[in-house]
Amino acid sequence: MDQIKNKLGEVFHRTMAHWNFDYNKLDETKVGVACIPWNDIDRAFLEGGIFEAIGFSYSMAKEDFAIRTAHQGCEQMARHYEVSDCTCQVVLIDNEVRAEVPTDLITD
């Protein structure tokens, strides 16, 4: 599961780069949230895919506020682009991958 978790962190960084942002350059306290399509997660997605909706926050006073702000951004982007079949979840807090991978996830 840790390998999948770390790959989700890479997908988040790749998605940020797609939108011309560098998560590593954002000031802490920072959070990255992504709308994760658990039913579509496979090796190809983990190696080259991007999330269709994300949210992020940075330079926040408190972690819980950073999480809430990033989560709202993800949900707003998902609504705007009419993304469905995914769940907005925390992927990164500062530089630590915090994604919670379902125990029944099978990737091919």
Where are the language model's segments positioned?
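Secreted/extracellular ectodomain signature
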Residues: 1-108
